[in-house]
Amino acid sequence: MQIVNAQDLTPLDSLYHQDSLTFGQRALLKPIQTWQHFSYGQSALNCQFEKSCSNFMVQAVLEKGVLRGTVIGTDRIVRCNSAARHYHLQNPHSKIQYDGRLVDPLEWKSEPAPGKSPLLATSLSIIPGLGRAYAGHPVDGLFSFLLVAGFAYNTYGHIKADNPIRTGINASFMTLFWLADFYGAYRTAKMVPPKFPQP
């Protein structure tokens, strides 16, 4: 029997030991659990969102499935940047928790007649980050572009070096961040209020 100090526990610790988790969920949640053990002791790594990005990812995976949940959680990681508060406060439905964290639930509220075209935003994401920029979040778009381009560059380098394992890992991350960019552009466009609100 392992004795664990209560202060060392993270929200994922008790969940990870449940029998109801699938193999895929366990495989994905283990790195998140490891991250929580590291980050929860570092005040500089406190998340500006409520739920934290790691707990948001866990919730997304459990409620939306491994693939869709991972894409949704990865979108949140991209959005957790220096412009997050500014973008959050532009949303008429935004909420701030008592401790100043940004309330960003998994189920978000879309505008019935959004001010930006979700179809165009999603289509523009063929070039990573462009759809987010079109939807009014250029900083998110820049982060998304840098992540997708960085992993694409690494993938190309590992292909040239004939390293199939690193090629596969980098290509997987490139694809994940690119899929998250499509989702994020769509989500952002759906949340943009109309320019001229209906009377």
What does each of the following model-derived ranges do?
Residues 14-199:
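Hydrophobic alpha-helical membrane segments
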